[in-house]
């Protein structure tokens, strides 16, 4: 492993990519420490602590923003507006034929237009979420008294939140283009990991104070370790369909005749279903939390609280839905079957064309179901334990199954991206 890092560092182009990625991450963390003007940050921190919001949907937002949400910094909204915009645009690409054609047939130009629409949507959603956050702070007297009713202060706060979310989106795009890995995923990874030390300290303090049994904490960390091993194994798992290429003569040379396989990953959509399911499941509870008279309403406490069974069921079904949704976007059986047919390939036992695509679709449905259930079970297990025991600490928002899946998944994706860069230069990678 150390030799691999040394090899990566020796490659000038790769070294520049790594340094650029680290620089963007540093800028992001610095932005997380810059407070928005006119906000009473101490009162806001006390409100989050006293209200127990660290174990609610807003606490989840706080984890995904690296603690910026509870401190009302310029990056408080984090990547939430971008995630929500991506969900909306990709759903519209299925519902609106013009957008679907643009996505599938537009080539690079079409992808650029879709990306541009997503950017504008991110800004619009950022404005809405910034306004909602401002209203929450105003309703709970978390804005400095001298500026509580000041229109100018409201405009500055909302625009600062919106600009911060747009800047995060831009930083993520820069990492994707000039750095290593997917920029948005890396920003999310950094945000979650940044909260781990605070979570560990809080849990150790709970043990010292007698609020949590030491053996429960040990079991939690052993479970987290086993979960990491399981995630690594499943992320590498794939179903390989045998493919045979028929022989063909071109001029005086004979081509084809070799056997290969078509790899289909079990967890094809990665961590995206969980990220998107969180955003959708959190939307109603977020609206309720931002309106004081709704915060203790029946729907908030009995349906959209993370420790209630209705929320767990909704969250489970959303992960299943987005797993299938993204598998259909990333892997098209008809397109794969047509490409095999054009190149003289076929799956033994199935005729080229429609029979092949139907078989691939059948296999895809099976492995997607397994991957979806795997993601769902890991994500909701801490919530089920909490719902049964009524111990909110066991929801493990910052060290729970959801966060571990995201962190390990992004880490593996980034390592593979770095390995691909190294293999292009004839060096052994991390996973070799």
Explain the meaning of each model-derived region:
Residues 1-432:
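N-terminal cationic and glycine-rich segments that engage phosphates or anionic surfaces
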């Amino acid at each position: 492993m150390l030799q691999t890092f040394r090899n990566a560092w020796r490659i000038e182009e790769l070294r520049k990519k790594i340094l650029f990625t680290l620089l963007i991450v540093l800028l992001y963390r610095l932005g997380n420490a810059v407070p928005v003007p006119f906000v009473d940050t101490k009162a806001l921190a006390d409100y989050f602590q006293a209200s127990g919001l660290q174990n609610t949907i807003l606490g989840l937002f706080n984890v995904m923003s690296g603690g910026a949400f509870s401190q009302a910094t310029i990056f408080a909204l984090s990547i939430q507006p971008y995630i929500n915009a991506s969900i909306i645009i990709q759903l519209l690409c299925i519902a609106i034929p013009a957008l679907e054609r643009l996505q599938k047939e537009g080539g690079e130009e079409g992808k650029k237009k879709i990306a541009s629409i997503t950017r504008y949507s991110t800004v619009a959603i950022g404005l809405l979420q910034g306004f909602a956050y401002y209203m929450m702070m105003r309703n709970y007297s978390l804005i400095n008294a001298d500026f509580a009713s000041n229109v100018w202060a409201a405009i500055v706060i909302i625009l600062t939140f919106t600009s911060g979310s747009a800047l995060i989106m831009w930083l993520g795009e820069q990492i994707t283009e000039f750095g290593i890995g997917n920029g948005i995923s890396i920003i999310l990874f950094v945000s979650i990991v940044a909260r781990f030390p605070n979570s560990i300290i809080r849990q150790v303090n709970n043990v010292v104070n007698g609020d949590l049994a030491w053996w429960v904490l040990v079991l939690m960390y052993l479970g987290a370790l086993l979960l990491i091993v399981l995630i690594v194994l499943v992320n590498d798992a794939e179903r390989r369909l045998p493919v045979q290429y028929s022989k063909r003569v071109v001029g005086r040379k004979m081509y084809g005749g070799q056997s290969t396989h078509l790899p289909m990953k079990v967890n094809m959509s990665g961590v995206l279903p969980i990220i998107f399911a969180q955003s959708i499941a959190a939307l109603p509870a977020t609206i309720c939390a931002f309106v004081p008279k709704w915060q203790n309403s029946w729907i908030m406490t009995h349906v959209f609280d993370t420790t209630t069974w209705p929320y767990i069921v909704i969250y489970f079904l959303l992960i299943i839905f987005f797993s299938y949704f993204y598998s259909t976007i990333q892997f098209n059986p008809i397109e794969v079957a047509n490409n095999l047919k054009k190149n003289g390939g076929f799956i033994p036992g199935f005729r080229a064309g429609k029979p092949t695509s139907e078989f691939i679709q059948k296999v895809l449905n099976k492995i997607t179901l397994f991957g979806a259930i795997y993601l769902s079970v890991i994500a909701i297990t801490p919530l089920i334990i909490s719902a049964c025991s009524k111990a909110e600490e066991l929801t493990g928002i910052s060290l729970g199954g959801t966060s571990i899946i995201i962190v390990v998944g992004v880490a593996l994706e980034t390592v593979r991206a770095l390995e691909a860069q190294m293999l292009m230069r004839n060096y052994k990678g991390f996973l070799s």
